[in-house]
């Protein structure tokens, strides 16, 4: 590889710096964000509707409860089906011809986001039914989640930590296992590949650091405002730019992948803490309905980037909070020096009266419960609110907008199949597609036995790198370089009710695959 822009952009050091900076930036914005201390009810666009639809605001009547449960179950089922066949196969596969969504790749992530979309749609259908009744206004589904902003932001911080840590670890794991940069980190790679070093380190570091992170975040054991003592306090503009750069870094992690934007290379990314690059879950009860064996198959790469896009949702919500932040909407007010104060008095938060949510009123009135001024019971933050206009704050989205445009540009021009290009599974990998037959079906096959079974070798799809072996019992597609007499013999001697072929990296027919 020549030392051009791509060489340095995708260099191991560049990738690891970006991956670990995202972790630091997410902790920093959580600490600086005044919304993290707000006692008001959390609201998240779209996701809040889905959460409220499934978890709370259930009417008292049994019939209404059953109706609500049936609707969100139907929404989930519709989302899964539409995500698989409409969005993944039709839109991404056939219409847009995206290589990264070839075959069944990326289907579970598509189905997840499709499910969120249909939960949002069905929540509005449910609201329409409630409005038709006329007396159910209290149960209308909105983007308010029924939990405090403080609690939600703590959950989001733990979630982003888990997602960012797994992502950073997978990037590190890939850098230390693969060899596009053979002269980089030779000693570290030698240590990393010894025995179970990478497995042991992952689980040890994950358990230890996650325990510390959860303890610090949930118990407020460490107060950021007491720790930094107002050193370089942030305002809504700087926080908006920080949130924007977090979005940029999330996209950079994907764009720095050596196989971006097609993800069709021969690099298998091992799942963190495991020896395998993919996970498979057998669904045995489907065998009674279908004649084939179905498995859920998730590859390490889609496991990694699926997590990134989940974290991206939380980061987008963080950016939204900074752009449209108004102190009184979050039970906060501005004191001397443009510092933010958080109201913790539940009585003052009932109606969010702007008169009571002010420095003048709270510093001159006494709380009868404590016999102290209201200000003394409020939380002081070093974060500032300078009242910047929306136009200025929206400038922070420019870096993210540029990143999204470049992301889409590379996918559109370099990550799509040509109209006449065959869209087949990655030819660099061996795979197996086995058609199972029940014993009753075999008994009807005119006395076919192992002794008189015939096998034929064909050239599938006119591709010399693959060899297709057909017999009366199964169909196997091998990479030609992997085919040996032992492989052929073991497959033909396998029982029809046995598990899938034993060749690495062969897999049974899987639907869907990520």
From Swiss-Prot:
Domain of life: Eukaryota
Stretches with biased composition (Basic and acidic residues): 438-448
Ranges per topology, Extracellular: 37-65, 132-154, 220-239, 317-394
UniProt main location, coarse: membrane
Membrane-spanning ranges: 16-36, 66-86, 111-131, 155-175, 199-219, 240-260, 296-316, 395-415
UniProt xrefs under InterPro entries: TMEM117
GO annotation terms (biological process): intrinsic apoptotic signaling pathway in response to endoplasmic reticulum stress
Stretches the record annotates as Disordered: 429-459, 486-514
Sites carrying sugar chains: 353, 371
Gene Ontology cellular-component terms listed: endoplasmic reticulum; plasma membrane
Outcome, altering residue 371 to A: Reduced N-glycosylation. Loss of N-glycosylation
Compartments it resides in: Cell membrane
Side Cytoplasmic, residues: 1-15, 87-110, 176-198, 261-295, 416-514
Keyword Transmembrane included in the entry's annotation: yes
Membrane topology label: Multi-pass membrane protein
Residues modified to Phosphothreonine: 453
Alphabetic keyword roster: Cell membrane, Glycoprotein, Membrane, Phosphoprotein, Transmembrane, Transmembrane helix
UniProt function note: Involved in endoplasmic reticulum (ER) stress-induced cell death pathway.
Similarity annotation: Belongs to the TMEM117 family.
Protein name stated in the entry: Transmembrane protein 117
Organism: Homo sapiens
């Amino acid at each position: 590889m020549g030392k051009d822009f791509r060489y340095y952009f995708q260099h191991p050091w560049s990738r690891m710096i970006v991956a670990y900076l995202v972790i630091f930036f997410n902790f920093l914005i959580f600490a600086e964000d005044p919304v993290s201390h707000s006692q008001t009810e959390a609201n998240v666009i779209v996701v809040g509707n889905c959460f409220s639809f499934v978890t709370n605001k259930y009417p008292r009547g049994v019939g209404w409860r059953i109706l609500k449960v049936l609707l969100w179950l139907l929404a989930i089922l519709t989302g899964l089906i539409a995500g698989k066949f409409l969005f993944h196969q039709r839109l991404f596969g056939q219409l847009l011809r995206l290589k990264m969504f070839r075959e069944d790749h990326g289907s579970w992530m598509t189905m997840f986001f499709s499910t969120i979309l249909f939960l949002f749609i069905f929540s509005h259908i449910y609201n329409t039914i409630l409005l038709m009744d006329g007396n159910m206004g209290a149960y209308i589904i909105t983007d308010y989640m029924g939990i405090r902003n403080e609690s939600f932001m703590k959950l989001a911080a733990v979630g982003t930590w888990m997602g960012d840590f797994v992502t950073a670890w997978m990037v590190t794991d890939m850098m230390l296992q693969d060899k596009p940069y053979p002269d980089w980190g030779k000693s570290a790679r030698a240590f990393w590949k010894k025995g179970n070093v990478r497995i042991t380190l992952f689980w040890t570091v994950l358990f230890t650091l996650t325990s510390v992170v959860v303890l610090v975040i949930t118990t407020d054991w460490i107060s950021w405002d007491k720790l930094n003592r107002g050193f370089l306090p942030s305002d809504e503009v700087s926080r908006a730019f920080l949130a924007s750069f977090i979005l940029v870094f999330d996209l950079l992690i994907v764009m720095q992948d050596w196989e971006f934007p097609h993800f069709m290379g021969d690099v298998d990314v091992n799942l963190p803490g495991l020896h395998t690059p993919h996970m498979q879950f057998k669904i045995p009860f489907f065998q009674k309905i279908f004649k084939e064996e179905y498995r859920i198959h998730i590859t390490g790469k889609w496991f990694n980037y699926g997590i990134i896009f989940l974290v991206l949702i939380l980061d987008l919500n963080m950016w939204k909070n900074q752009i449209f932040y108004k102190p009184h909407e979050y039970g906060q007010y501005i004191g001397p020096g443009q510092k933010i104060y958080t109201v913790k008095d539940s009585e003052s938060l009932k109606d969010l009266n702007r008169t009571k949510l002010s420095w003048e009123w709270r510093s001159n009135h006494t709380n009868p419960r404590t016999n102290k001024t209201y200000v003394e019971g409020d939380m002081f933050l070093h974060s500032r609110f300078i009242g910047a206009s929306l136009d200025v704050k929206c400038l922070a989205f420019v870096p993210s907008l540029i990143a999204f445009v470049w992301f889409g540009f590379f996918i559109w021009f370099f990550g799509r199949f040509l109209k006449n290009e065959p869209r087949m599974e990655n030819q660099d990998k061996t795979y197996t597609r086995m058609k199972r037959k029940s014993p009753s079906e075999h008994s009807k096959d005119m006395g076919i036995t192992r002794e008189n079974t015939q096998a034929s070798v064909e050239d599938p799809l006119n591709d010399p790198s693959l060899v297709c072996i057909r017999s009366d019992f199964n169909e196997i597609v091998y990479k030609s370089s992997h085919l040996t007499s032992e492989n052929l013999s073991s497959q033909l001697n396998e029982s029809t009710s046995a598990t899938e072929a034993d060749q690495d990296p062969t897999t049974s027919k899987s639907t869907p695959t990520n």
